[in-house]
């Protein structure tokens, strides 16, 4: 197990070195605790008083663990149209060995298409990827 402070310091260094304007990370609303720790480390590493860099922070939707929480659910507020990239997304997910099962599993090909269509319906496009904007400095 890696100490939380070590994770945070590594992220701080990468943010300072790379100077990103957007960081996409996990969400705190997850059953996968590694994802929650990742989100918290990014949150700490990019706190406004620490960093000269003020990147926008988005949390991505994980097709499974973000849907299986009992108390809270992932609520997106940013959508990216992916109609031109849906085939590439499916191909990329197919390389994620051991994480795909038959539908109705969310990470099956049919599950991923269903989620993309649902997020598309929410945002008025054919297919969309959903995110949660946690911080943006304009």
Task: Enumerate the predicted regions with their spans.
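Metal-dependent de-N-acetylase/amidase catalytic core
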Residues: 1-138
């Amino acid at each position: 197990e890696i100490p939380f402070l070590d994770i945070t310091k590594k992220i701080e260094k990468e943010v300072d070195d790379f100077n990103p304007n957007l960081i996409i990370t996990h969400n705190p609303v997850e059953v996968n605790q590694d994802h929650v720790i990742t989100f918290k480390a990014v949150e700490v590493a990019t706190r406004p008083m620490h960093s000269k860099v003020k990147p926008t922070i988005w949390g991505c939707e994980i097709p499974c663990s973000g849907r299986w929480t009992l108390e809270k659910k992932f609520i997106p507020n940013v959508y990216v149209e992916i109609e031109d990239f849906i085939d590439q997304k499916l191909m990329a997910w197919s390389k994620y060995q051991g994480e795909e099962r038959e539908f109705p599993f969310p990470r099956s090909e049919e599950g991923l298409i269903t989620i993309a269509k649902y997020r598309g319906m929410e945002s008025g496009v054919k297919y969309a990827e959903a995110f949660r904007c946690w911080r943006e400095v304009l």
